[in-house]
């Protein structure tokens, strides 16, 4: 399962939006945040982060089965992702410029819609993605058979199309490359300081 929403009733546009949103969120959760924690704390901190993030993905849903345990995983994940999500958003804005996407709109939508999500972090990168691609993401969706009313992210400057998935992937790759370079320099700097002590 890549997305948490119910997929049975999704049409091509719904599947595309879900995929693009997943790429946006995983730019932070799956790439930039682990690199950030690797840079500042080495492998131990990176694996701790990934453990918490995986627990949130598996049991962080608001349902009766995981309510007590999942709540703590979700809150800790929110705390650990607070800084990396914002770094990811700015790396994606730079990546949008390098990819030739709409970086000005990415900044505009980021500033306006970055809190249009129940999580304090998820819409950070989704807002940049929506703005960079000139599309509208999020909105109402079904989870575990129940309709969840959610605000939209971005403006529908143009309709969502399946080609937005490779565009989203391109933005992920460029943002990841930028992050890898920056965090490698930070990690080398920290290791250099440690050897001097």
State each model region's role.
Residues 1-48, 52, 60-197:
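Hydrophobic alpha-helical transmembrane segments
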